[in-house]
């Protein structure tokens, strides 16, 4: 028996991974481009996870950073340039993995530039949490996902 089930069986739970899947399904996205700050091995696990969930990964790029304490120091302007110049193929959306990566403030700008949905770990966590507790999750300034209701 799962500890959560014995403690609070009706608990609503989300993770960055499950929230990303929920958001991609809500938006009817099938093809994604994935960006991570992780080392290659962990990056490849992220890609495999989405492939196992039946998403077509059109492209992938990663920064090869080992430590969360270094990931949060990545400059958002640098991220914007990297993501703008990344070949996303014919992806319908870009998923940016990692809750430590400072990407929330550039999502809307990226969506406008790339003309694609841009989803990040923190963004989908916020969206899915609000969705699960039945709160209005229409929030401006953090991407088109929040306008999908």
Regions found by a protein language model. Give the residues of each.
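Catalytic alpha/beta core domains of metabolic enzymes, predominantly
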Residues: 79-80, 98-104, 114, 120-121
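Short, flexible loop segments at boundaries between secondary-structure elements
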Residues: 65-68, 116-138
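Short hydrophobic/aromatic-enriched beta-strand-loop microsegments
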Residues: 33-34, 54-60, 114-122, 137-141
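Active-site rim beta-loop-alpha module in soluble metabolic enzymes
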Residues: 41-97
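Short, small-residue-biased leader/transition segments that mark boundaries at the very start
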Residues: 1-3
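Conserved beta-alpha
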Residues: 6-66, 146-147
């Amino acid at each position: 028996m799962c500890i959560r089930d014995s403690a609070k069986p009706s608990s609503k739970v989300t993770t960055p991974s499950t929230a990303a899947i929920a958001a991609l399904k809500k938006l009817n996205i099938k093809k994604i481009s994935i960006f991570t700050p992780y080392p290659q091995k962990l990056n490849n696990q992220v890609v495999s996870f989405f492939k196992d969930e039946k998403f077509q990964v059109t492209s992938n790029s990663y920064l090869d950073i080992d430590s969360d304490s270094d990931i949060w120091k990545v400059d958002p302007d640098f991220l914007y340039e990297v993501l703008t110049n990344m070949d996303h193929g014919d992806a319908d959306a870009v998923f940016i993995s990692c809750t430590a990566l400072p990407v929330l403030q550039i999502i809307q700008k990226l969506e406008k530039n790339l003309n694609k949905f841009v989803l990040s770990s923190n963004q989908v966590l916020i969206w899915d949490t609000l969705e699960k507790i039945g709160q209005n999750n229409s929030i401006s300034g953090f991407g088109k996902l929040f306008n999908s209701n």
